[in-house]
Swiss-Prot record:
Source species: Burkholderia pseudomallei (strain K96243)
Function of the protein: Catalyzes the oxidation of 5,10-methylenetetrahydrofolate to 5,10-methenyltetrahydrofolate and then the hydrolysis of 5,10-methenyltetrahydrofolate to 10-formyltetrahydrofolate.
Recorded metabolic or biological pathway in which this protein acts: One-carbon metabolism; tetrahydrofolate interconversion
The protein's name in its UniProt record: Bifunctional protein FolD
Assembly and oligomerization: Homodimer.
Keywords of this entry: Amino-acid biosynthesis, Histidine biosynthesis, Hydrolase, Methionine biosynthesis, Multifunctional enzyme, NADP, One-carbon metabolism, Oxidoreductase, Purine biosynthesis
InterPro entries the UniProt entry points to: Aminoacid_DH-like_N_sf, NAD(P)-bd_dom_sf, THF_DH/CycHdrlase, THF_DH/CycHdrlase_cat_dom, THF_DH/CycHdrlase_CS, THF_DH/CycHdrlase_NAD-bd_dom
NCBIfam families: PRK10792.1, PRK14186.1, PRK14189.1
Catalytic reaction list: (6R)-5,10-methylene-5,6,7,8-tetrahydrofolate + NADP(+) = (6R)-5,10-methenyltetrahydrofolate + NADPH; (6R)-5,10-methenyltetrahydrofolate + H2O = (6R)-10-formyltetrahydrofolate + H(+)
Enzyme Commission number: 1.5.1.5, 3.5.4.9
Residues annotated to bind NADP(+): G165, R166, S167, S190
Coiled-coil annotated spans: none
UniProt GO molecular function: methenyltetrahydrofolate cyclohydrolase activity; methylenetetrahydrofolate dehydrogenase (NADP+) activity
GO cellular component terms listed in the entry, alphabetical order: cytosol
Length: 285
């Protein structure tokens, strides 16, 4: 059996078209959605991510603002800029690209963003509200994964789901969203004993640890849905995920590729969150 491919590029295209329609409707009422992206330093991977985010905004009718600063930028200067953006009515979403230079406290920076403009969903107010099932914003990557389940009609209610990874950005919010959807969720991580015993019993496995081949074919229940959030490089320098795709795709029922799976969805859900922020602001105006 070969798994059905969950195509993140195709689904993203559909969702971005819907976002562009909503953006056009808002713009017609004088509320064009606006996203500000802040990049500090010259991390090459961060530069690529920021470029992709800005392009997605431009391609779909959003106003975008890119603030680029040298790695020597002080924390007070960055906080002052965030304060300005918080008060700017043209900006509905603020995103600070992580990681930040060592002398800047990323936690303090994220907390400085107004919760209603925290389109990454990282602010403590939004992270906490996720526990109650009523966040202003869901973190983009887990939100994108949930849209994949929806589009491919993957049943979540009553399903056994394993999330490998416990980061605040993916692992923990992913587990909460699956729980909210009615799945029975197990979170596994570097200290988990016998990872395979958990994954073999799972209907759904989400791998999000940033480690190659953390999930192999012998660890997967036949017909399971496997979501690969990992971003790594193989020995030839090619992009790969956390899952041994060649092997697991022969066992799983559905699987996401890397690249072309979860990655495009993350930026798409950033657009969706920004649209939602703009719609709220327009309703309150």
């Amino acid at each position: 059996m070969t798994a059905t491919l969950i195509d993140g590029n195709a689904l993203s295209k559909t969702l971005r078209a819907q976002a562009a329609e909503r953006a056009a409707a808002l713009a017609a009422r004088g509320h064009r959605p606006g996203l500000a992206v802040i990049l500090v330093g010259d991390n090459p991977a961060s530069e690529v991510y920021v470029r992709n985010k800005i392009k997605a905004c431009e391609d779909n009718g959003f106003f975008s603002l890119k603030d680029r600063y040298p790695a020597t930028l002080s924390e007070p200067e960055l906080l002052a800029r965030i304060d300005e953006l918080n008060r700017d009515p043209k900006i509905h979403g603020i995103l600070v690209q992580l990681p930040l230079p060592a002398h800047i406290d990323s936690h303090k920076v994220i907390e400085a963003i107004a919760p209603e403009k925290d389109v990454d969903g990282f602010h403590v107010a939004n992270a906490g509200a996720l526990l109650t099932g009523k966040p202003l914003f869901r973190p983009c990557t887990p939100y994108g994964v949930m849209k994949m389940f929806e589009a491919y009609k993957i049943p979540l209610q009553g399903a056994n789901a394993v999330v490998i990874g416990r980061s605040n950005i993916v692992g923990k919010p992913m587990a909460l969203l699956l729980l909210e959807a009615g799945a029975t969720v197990t979170i596994c991580h570097s200290k988990t004993r016998e990872l395979a015993a958990h994954t073999r019993a799972a209907d759904i496995v989400v791998a999000a640890v940033g480690k190659r081949n953390v999930l192999t074919a012998d660890m997967v229940k036949p017909g399971a849905t496997v979501i690969d959030v990992g971003m790594n490089r193989n020995d030839e320098g090619k992009l790969c995920g956390d899952v041994d795709f060649a092997g697991v795709s022969q066992v799983a029922g559905h699987i996401t590729p890397v690249p072309g799976g979860v990655g495009p969805m993350t930026i798409t859900m950033l657009l969706v969150n920004t649209i939602e922020a703009a719609e709220r602001a327009a309703a309150a105006a």
